[in-house]
Amino acid sequence: MTKIGLPYVGRLQVYERGEANILFVLGQLKELQPNADYSHLTLVGHSNGGDISMFCAKRHPELVSKVITLDNLRVPFVLDHKLKILSFRSKDPNFKTDPGVLPTPQQAKADDIDIVNTKFQHTDMSDRGPDAVKETIQATLDHFLSDSASSELAPANTDKLIVTNLGPPPYP
């Protein structure tokens, strides 16, 4: 557990390695596509990947414009930069968010941070989770990425699927 005054105990090297990986891939992409925009990145991650995304956004605000986390538990949200943040939170008693990671409801509102509380389990929010969970998350994610106002963003209805039949593959 991260303790106040002792940030990232036992995890700092993991976060720094994740940050280095992101920067390495960014460098490789710049060589392949030199004219692309690399100063408005959207970082996305589940659990530790969400922590790494938030850690990297904190250290490289000049590169990151959006962060999407799926139940990150250890790294506090970036509040001192104007990032667009969406965070899906699980309702899993086995995976508890460390104190100080989430902003207060007042801070989230003031900084236009969208926090979506779900009824999902932590591990179901990964790419190995049930299709129904992924579809529900995708619907909210699509809305967020469309640059809609955060005040219009609401928790996705997890009881009723939006997409029930995708049809035959391949998918775009």
Language-model segments: residues:
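Short beta-strand/loop motif that positions the catalytic acidic residue
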Residues: L86-R89
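Serine-hydrolase catalytic machinery in alpha/beta-hydrolase-like enzymes
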Residues: M1-A36
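Extracytoplasmic/secreted proteins, especially bacterial periplasmic and envelope-associated proteins
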Residues: R17, N21-F24, D51-I52, A132, ...
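Conserved alpha/beta-hydrolase "acid-adjacent" motif
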Residues: N94-V101
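Alpha/beta-hydrolase-fold serine-hydrolase catalytic core, especially in secreted/extracellular enzymes
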Residues: D142-P172
